[in-house]
Regions:
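Buried hydrophobic packing segments
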Residues: 29, 87-95, 146-153
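Extreme N-terminal basic, low-complexity initiation segments
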Residues: 1-9, 13
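C-terminal binding/interaction regions
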Residues: 15-22, 26, 35-38, 118-156
């Protein structure tokens, strides 16, 4: 005799769409974090800072080469989660050739976004949109860790 097993799905179609979207976003974050071109130690750095998240233990060190107020090289290293690594990777790719003032501006934007003072990602910071969304609000401290290290550098 055969036994038939019936089950009722606990998910609605809209839930399944959201689950697929969440998996897609998580895969995109993994993809970004896996771009480790600038996960390196810069020996001839001009500026450096470390940040540590006391909640989870993530830590990151950022070393920069800044010449004539312009960022010419960006290296990061640390023991951190995929969200922190993805943020550091995006920043390292997108801030090369930026003035210190622009780096300061993006650090301020990041903090204000997660403190709900910004509703959406400004066009000039669109490269951050995969990380800067409501879904990742619980990972705020992880995402902000590289920004905190950068802010220490540009504030001096």
């Amino acid at each position: 005799s055969t036994t038939k097993i019936y089950f009722k799905s606990i998910y609605k179609i809209s839930d399944i769409h959201e689950i697929k979207l969440n998996v897609y976003m998580d895969l995109k974050i993994l993809e970004i974090a896996s771009d480790t071109e600038n996960n390196k130690n810069i020996k001839n750095y001009t500026h450096a800072a470390k940040s540590k998240n006391p909640l989870c233990g993530d830590e990151i060190q950022i070393k920069l080469v800044i010449k004539k107020e312009k960022l010419v090289d960006f290296g990061y290293q640390g023991k951190s989660c995929v969200y922190c690594q993805a943020t550091a990777s995006l920043l390292s790719k997108n801030l090369i050739n930026s003035e210190k003032s622009k780096i300061n501006e993006i650090c301020d934007f990041a903090k204000s976004f997660f403190n709900k003072k910004q509703e959406s990602v400004e066009k000039k910071w669109s490269f951050l949109s995969k990380l800067f969304n409501e879904k990742n609000i619980s990972r705020k401290e992880c995402i902000l860790l590289p920004f905190n290290a950068l802010k220490k550098i540009v504030s001096n």
